[in-house]
């Protein structure tokens, strides 16, 4: 009978006390079959479930990051407003959705404007009323300026639905009333020809911007100078024409305005299309529609002045 206080003999097959080593030690195989043994706690070969740790997950791909120059973009930095960087614009789906949304809004705006111009031009009582009551034009101009400044300068209303749609609708109707009032002062033939010329110019510029490799967005300084020149010329022309009408000066200003806003249309179109030095954030679809629509309407008004057939 063994002493209870003595350590258990090797013959006791207690799992906590392995048996004595065989004579000569353990043999080492030349090649370990099946690779290295599993570390304690990890699943042993042949078992379908882990012993203590979960199975390792498959590797995940990193999300696209907004890298600066020198990180995969050949050192060229694309300036994008807010938090949207080149990574987001590399996604064709995001860009195409943005472009479709912008041009859908522009199409609705142009349809409303053409309808107002048609009413003010072809319906004689309406045409006579707006020619006699110039206050309609000035009220529309005030609404146009206020809504344009809010949409262009205030990010909150521009991005918050439904305020952005409400402001854009007010802006569109104000611009339509202004354009309709101007159109009522010209012959119907001149209005139709100006519409056709504007449509041809706008479509041609859009197709050109889709195809060309010329980056108009890199010439921001040039467009600022053009805008200042057009503004100063407009002020001088208004002062001169207020005292005495000078036909050639009026035509010169109209031609300069048509050329400048055609270039502005190319610039704003490339801002919307993306993949240029400067782009518009995908959240600012209202801004894209606002700019392109304004360019098209101003091209129409300047071309209409060049036609010169007043009532």
Curated annotation (Swiss-Prot):
Pfam family, any one: Bax1-I
UniProt-annotated location(s): Membrane; Lysosome membrane; Endosome membrane
Annotated GO CC locations: endoplasmic reticulum; endosome membrane; extracellular exosome; Golgi apparatus; Golgi membrane; intracellular membrane-bounded organelle; lysosomal membrane; membrane
Main location: membrane
Topology within the bilayer: Multi-pass membrane protein
GO biological process: apoptotic signaling pathway; negative regulation of catalytic activity; negative regulation of extrinsic apoptotic signaling pathway via death domain receptors; negative regulation of Fas signaling pathway; negative regulation of neuron apoptotic process; negative regulation of protein localization to plasma membrane; positive regulation of blood vessel remodeling
GO molecular function, one term: calcium channel activity
Domain of life: Eukaryota
Entry keyword set: Endosome, Lysosome, Membrane, Phosphoprotein, Transmembrane, Transmembrane helix
Protein purpose: Negatively regulates aortic matrix metalloproteinase-9 (MMP9) production and may play a protective role in vascular remodeling.
Record's protein name: Protein lifeguard 3
Native source organism of the sequence: Homo sapiens (Human)
